[in-house]
From Swiss-Prot:
Name of this protein: Probable trafficking protein particle complex subunit 13 homolog
InterPro entries reported in the protein's UniProt record: TRAPPC13, TRAPPC13_C, TRAPPC13_M, TRAPPC13_N
GO cellular component, one term: TRAPPIII protein complex
Top-rank taxon: Eukaryota
SS bonds (residue pairs): none
A Pfam family matched in the record: TRAPPC13_M
Origin organism lineage: Eukaryota, Metazoa, Ecdysozoa, Nematoda, Chromadorea
Family: Belongs to the TRAPPC13 family.
């Protein structure tokens, strides 16, 4: 953290001290290895002398028994709480009155006034007054802590000075998201895959990773819970962990209205570092690209997974009107060239007029003539008003034995 000073006068009666408050760390321990079965006992004797000098009773552990204060200004990461102690010291031989301290934090986009209780106080000679201030860091990039001091001497002269402390803020984690839509799922479910990477230089433990959905969706977390679920939440530097969420429409009776929705929700993450310092981040609103279904959408509602050869079976289908106008639809069936599955239902059947955001159900009778995995194709839908044709192939696969 670099420091700059701006004074209204070169002779100041007060001095300003700013110290960042951070948690200590365990002192590293230089272990001494010796052979426990050494017949001479020299190694054990030497290890005992080392323990006596270092005041450490255990040399078989990677960390010591003592804590050490931070030796330098360490990195500050987005989502953490920046805590510092600001102290105004009267270094003169006379008292000063009406001492007021103002602390501001300036970023590239805003200037935040931090709460400070040092206002209109009197500081006697060689005395001081200060306060601990905390602020949650919500932006990355260069930050400037501005501390301004106003006071008055006993002779009535108004004095003023301020100090600037610059420090950078980095990203502790990197979040990448991917959206998946099940094309054959009429419920308009959306799957979100979130990849979280530890971009800091220290270990972190993910306490919570949740998806706060928008008002149109409800969310279900899909995670694999093993015998030790906490182990997978520990992220070392550059480690990546994946999370999967399923978002389902709240209004199950109008799933077609969800096809144009792009706002999904926000990811909310919280973690702790190796010494228990807490961090929290929330992403901006996640946006997905709405899938394009065209004017009509065909889905298979019910079909057997396995059938016997030369035994007919039925496939239940549902046709949605995804357009903004009514459609007059007709069903035509084309037999595939390989004829491994023969559709026995009549062709040219009228499905009637279908209003917007509505659906119509129909069934297909299929006769399998060859074994293996066979695909159902040849479904043709015609809008008799506009003469537009919609082709649907490979709508389902059946195993014929």
């Amino acid at each position: 953290m670099t420091e700059n000073i701006s004074n209204s006068s070169t002779q100041q009666l007060l001095a300003l001290r700013v110290m960042r408050l951070a948690r200590p760390k365990f002192a590293p321990l230089d272990g001494f290895s010796h052979d426990p079965v050494d017949p001479t006992g020299f190694g054990e004797l030497l290890a005992g002398k080392v323990a006596e000098i270092s005041k450490e009773s255990r040399h078989d552990l990677p960390i010591g028994e003592y804590l050490i204060a931070p030796q330098m200004f360490e990195n500050i990461y987005l989502g953490e709480t920046f805590t510092f102690y600001v102290n105004v010291v009267n270094e003169s031989e006379s008292n000063v009155v009406n001492v007021s301290l103002k602390c501001e934090l300036q970023t590239s986009t805003q200037r935040v006034v931090l709460p400070c209780s040092v206002q209109d106080v009197t500081i006697e000679s060689t005395k001081c007054d200060g306060q601990v201030i905390s602020h949650e860091v919500k932006e990355i990039g260069q930050h400037i802590l501005i501390c301004s001091v106003n006071y008055k001497t006993l002779s009535g002269e108004n004095m003023y000075f301020r100090k600037f402390f610059k420090f950078p803020v980095s990203k502790p984690i990197d979040v990448k998201t991917k959206f998946y839509s099940a094309e054959d799922n009429a419920n308009q479910d959306v799957y979100l895959e979130a990849q979280i990477e530890n971009t800091s230089n220290s270990n972190m433990f993910l306490e919570r990773v949740e998806l706060d959905p928008s008002q149109h969706y409800k969310v279900t977390s899909i995670s694999h819970e093993d015998e030790f679920p906490e182990v997978g939440k520990l992220l070392k530097p550059k480690d990546i962990r994946q999370f999967l969420f399923c978002l389902s429409p709240v209004d199950v009776n109008n799933t077609l209205g969800y096809k144009d929705l792009t706002s999904i929700g926000k990811l909310d993450m919280s973690w702790r570092t190796s010494m228990g310092e807490k961090g929290r981040l929330q992403t901006s609103a996640l946006q997905r690209i709405a899938p394009g279904y065209g004017d009509v959408r065909l889905s298979v509602e019910k079909t057997p997974a396995c059938v016997d050869v030369q035994k007919p079976f039925e496939v239940a289908c549902r046709l949605y009107n995804c357009s903004e106008r009514a459609l007059d639809l007709q069903l035509r069936l084309e037999q595939p060239s390989n004829r491994q599955l023969v559709i026995c239902s009549p062709s040219g059947v009228s499905l009637g007029q279908l209003p917007p955001s509505r659906y119509v159900d129909f069934a297909l009778n299929v006769f399998p003539v060859a074994v293996g995995i066979q695909s159902i194709s040849g479904i043709r839908i015609t809008d008799t008003f506009t003469k537009r044709h919609y082709e649907h192939d490979d709508i389902a696969q059946i195993f014929v034995s």
